[in-house]
């Protein structure tokens, strides 16, 4: 994990697609906005929902706090110093961006969605926090708990980084072959 204080940024990297349920993530962040005015949400990626998401961000008066910078070729450098990784997908296999964020020691809040890829990696409360699909309130509460409790954030970070050893590529491929 990164030593010292992280950037006051909550981050995700994904396609801007309905499957990712980004409106829920933005709504959960908006619930945090007043209590944590120093934080911003950065959503890296491109896709069909960009205009809709920008309209939502504008309607919530969060244009200076929720950023859609598009595609970043140096995404790992962008994500590494952030405070938290969030994924709000309605369904997902094993998310590469989630694995990369965990491997860099970012505390993560991720929906516990079918097919169950996140559940294969995250032990909720130990190395990340799983929340029910579509549950904005639960996502808000999980994000808030990490921001309010530096000891929890540090514990999640220390455990998250172990994903690098527990889930090398060959192990992930073997587990998927067992499922299929």
Sequence positions of predicted segments:
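Short hydrophobic beta-strand element within catalytic cores of glycosyltransferases
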Residues: 107-112
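Conserved acidic donor-binding segment of nucleotide-sugar-dependent glycosyltransferases
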Residues: 123-125, 129-136, 145-150
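Nucleotide-activated donor-binding/catalytic signature segment of Leloir-type glycosyltransferases, i.e.
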Residues: 54-70
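A short alpha->beta transition loop at the rim of the catalytic pocket in nucleotide-sugar-dependent
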Residues: 76, 83, 105
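Aromatic "clamp/platform" in nucleotide-sugar-dependent glycosyltransferases that forms part
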Residues: 71, 90
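A short, well-ordered alpha-helix in the C-terminal region of glycosyltransferases
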Residues: 138, 145, 152-166, 178
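A conserved mid-protein helix/loop that constitutes part of the nucleotide-sugar donor-binding site
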Residues: 8, 12-31, 48-54, 96, ...
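C-terminal alpha-helical cap of glycosyltransferases
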Residues: 169-180
């Amino acid at each position: 994990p990164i030593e010292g204080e992280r950037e006051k940024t909550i981050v995700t990297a994904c396609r801007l697609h309905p499957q990712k349920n980004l409106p829920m993530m933005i709504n959960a962040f908006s619930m945090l906005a007043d209590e944590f005015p120093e934080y911003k949400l950065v959503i890296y990626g491109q896709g069909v929902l960009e205009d809709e998401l920008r309209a939502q961000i504008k309607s919530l008066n969060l244009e200076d706090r929720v950023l859609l910078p598009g595609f970043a070729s140096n995404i790992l450098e962008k994500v590494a110093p952030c405070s938290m990784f969030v994924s709000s997908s309605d369904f997902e296999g094993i998310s590469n961006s989630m694995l990369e964020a965990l491997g860099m020691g970012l505390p993560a809040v991720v929906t516990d969605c079918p097919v169950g890829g996140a559940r294969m990696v995250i032990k909720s409360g130990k190395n990340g926090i799983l929340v029910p699909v579509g549950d904005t309130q639960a996502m808000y509460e999980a994000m808030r708990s990490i921001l309010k409790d530096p000891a929890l954030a540090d514990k999640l970070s220390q455990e998250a980084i172990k994903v690098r050893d527990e889930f090398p590529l060959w192990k992930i491929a073997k587990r998927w072959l067992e499922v299929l």
